[in-house]
């Protein structure tokens, strides 16, 4: 079910479009759109319905494929750069904390060391974490991504 509806003129005026060729492109697109918007209207109405239960849908796929993880990490790096300039600071911290949760979730579920060019964002996640529980997880990840993964999956 989709709950996002955008004015075409707004998207064009701000140069907003989906990144082509990546999975989970909405995870990168939606935050950029919301940060550009001067006004957002929330509604409980279904705007449109799409079938994500079809065979091969990434929404319901078991586990994480290498491509899914690579695309997610690329998205998270892109969002980290965007979030660096967000004001006010409280909003920036909340966005970074959410990004930390997404990154740590990905690192817990997939052994990222096998990815070409992978560099664990150990200190970045520690800087981004806000809540005590998330800071503890980020600290463990910073000390040892392998131990973090074992603890999270035990």
Each model region followed by its residue ranges:
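Conserved nucleotide-sugar donor-binding catalytic segment
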Residues: 1-63
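Catalytic cores of nucleotide-enabled group-transfer and carboxylate-activating enzymes in metabolic
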Residues: 1-5, 17-22, 49, 66, ...
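Gram-positive cell-envelope targeting signals
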Residues: 16, 37, 58-59, 72-76, ...
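Catalytic core of nucleotide-sugar-dependent glycosyltransferases
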Residues: 45-54, 60-87, 109-125
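Short secondary-structure transition/capping segments
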Residues: 71-74, 91-99, 129-143
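Membrane-interface aromatic/basic loop that binds lipid-linked glycans or pyrophosphate carriers
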Residues: 108-154
């Amino acid at each position: 079910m989709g709950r996002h509806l955008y004015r075409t003129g707004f998207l064009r005026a701000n140069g907003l479009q989906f990144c082509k060729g990546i999975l989970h492109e909405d995870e990168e697109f939606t935050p950029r759109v919301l940060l550009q918007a001067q006004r957002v209207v929330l509604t409980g109405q279904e705007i449109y319905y799409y079938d994500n239960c079809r065979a091969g849908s990434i929404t319901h796929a078991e586990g994480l494929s290498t491509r899914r993880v690579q695309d997610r990490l690329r998205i998270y790096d892109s969002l980290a750069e965007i979030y660096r300039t967000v004001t006010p600071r409280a909003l920036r911290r909340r966005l970074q904390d959410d990004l930390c949760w997404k990154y740590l979730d990905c690192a817990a579920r997939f052994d990222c060391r096998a990815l070409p060019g992978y560099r664990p964002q150990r200190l970045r996640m520690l800087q981004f974490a806000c809540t005590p529980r998330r800071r503890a997880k980020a600290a463990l990840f910073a000390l040892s991504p392998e131990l973090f993964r074992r603890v999270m999956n035990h």
